[in-house]
Amino acid sequence: TLNKIRYSPMQGAHLSLIYRYYAHDYWAMFAHSFGESSSVQNENGWCLSGEITPSRYWKLFASIDLFSFPWWKYRISKPSQGVDGLLQVTFAPHENLTMYLNYRYKRKERDVSGTNGKITLPVYHHRLRYRLNYSPGELFSFRTTADYNHFHSLGKLPGQGYQLTQVITCRPLHFPLKTELQGSYFYTDDYDTRVYIAEKGLLYTFYTPSFQGEGVRVAINLRYDLNTHWMVIAKFGQTIYMNRSEIGSGYDLIASNKKADLQMQLRLKF
């Protein structure tokens, strides 16, 4: 069950309270809903959020989510609970220039390695993101994103990770070709501090791969609308790692520090 209450005490401000209850023995293969987990199962929680627009240029948003898992799940072999908080400030001085800065804090529980699930300890994850969107004209638009992660738990050295991504989009006015070029640099200490970098994929698809270690990622996405019926999309991306000489293992082993991917799509609409 999912229940929501929304209240607006004044113009430009509102509060929302969401309660969710997903039984641990509930199964829905393709269901998606609001929650900490990706599946609609084994989760209870309360989420309180609020947004206020003090002026035409500024917007403040804050939320806190208190959740619990009544049954065991990945990396935790007993009932557990946690908290997820978010604070975001958005500044839009002009219609073609917007930016925001947000801070996210998350605390969860995890089994201690080597104890067979008998001992659990809290883990803490701090995330900081800055994003700038700028469109100087109708031809080009730019998006800059900087992320920083900090992860720590009791009895373990803290780790950190960060990434910087620049996206350049070109939309010619009198030519039906849209080009998006994206470049990223990432560095993380370990798997827990991995970074996620969203990329524009094919039509009706989402692509947000995770990266760990040190390296760069470049991708180019081309969309050409031949006419009102035909459309072609092609995407090429390559990841280059600076801290390893091979990628993967077993049958997926790549004896190089480079990994490339190519995607294409043809659509006929009638």
Language-model region placement:
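Exposed, low-structure sequence patches enriched in small/polar residues
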Residues: 1-270
